[in-house]
A protein has these predicted regions:
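Substrate-binding N-lobe of the ribokinase-like
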Residues: 2-73, 80-87
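Ribokinase/PfkB-type carbohydrate-kinase core domain
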Residues: 43-46, 50-55, 70-212
Length: 212
């Protein structure tokens, strides 16, 4: 919910949408409630031409209240115990996983054990050569060290911003390292193929083994 009204969003859905814009066969996987907002969401997805797998569950469709400060920096009020906290691992979701070449997920959807276990099952069902992109996307206090660590072990591409990198450095016990060395340390420790660091107005950096 933005100041100007309702807008469909979320990092993984945005990823799926932009992948589709490049002509790739992309699917957004989540869950919707049994309510009017879910119907509106489906309508928007279909209008945008975005494929989706979003089972209906007996929880309200998820919403986020977004407020922008004078510089346009957002703050988020993320409603809890909603549909996407309870994504079921259905046969359809499993079939999608088994045919996936790239998957993107974040930390927020893992705040509840139901969706967290579905994400793990999805990742376990993907082909061995699947690109697994963890967009860490820390929000409020909806994350733990264990959840972050588990996803970093399961991904081969990590996307993180400079503020999140500071938090991760503190969390994992290397706060004194500079930004570049933190990235190299994470890249090697988790045997990543790529680490993408975004720095807001200062641009982005891509780290791969032996190269930045």
């Amino acid at each position: 919910m933005l100041p100007e009204g309702k807008k469909l969003g979320g990092a993984p859905a945005n990823f799926a949408f932009h992948a589709g814009q490049f002509g790739l066969n992309s699917i957004a996987v989540s869950a919707l409630g049994e309510d009017k907002l879910a119907d509106e969401t489906v309508q928007q997805l279909e209008e945008k031409g975005l494929q989706y797998c979003m089972p209906r569950v007996p929880y309200p469709t998820g919403t986020v209240q977004v407020k922008l400060d004078d510089e346009g920096i957002p703050t988020y009020d993320i409603k809890e115990n909603v549909a996407w906290d309870n994504i079921p691992f259905t046969d359809e979701v499993k079939a999608i996983a088994e045919n996936t070449k790239a998957v993107c997920w974040g930390s927020l959807a893992q705040r509840n054990v139901v969706s967290r276990e579905t994400i793990y099952k999805f990742l376990d069902a993907t082909p061995a050569d699947c690109m697994k992109i963890f967009d860490i996307n820390l929000r409020q206090d909806f994350y733990t060290k264990d959840v972050i660590c588990e996803s970093m072990k399961r991904c081969n591409v990590l996307k993180i911003n400079d503020e999140e990198l500071v938090l991760i450095g503190r969390m994992f016990g290397y706060p004194g390292l500079d930004i570049e060395n933190k990235c190299w340390l994470i890249l090697g420790k988790y045997d990543l193929d790529m680490l993408v660091l975004t720095c807001s107005v200062n641009g982005s950096y891509v780290f791969t083994p032996g190269e930045m």
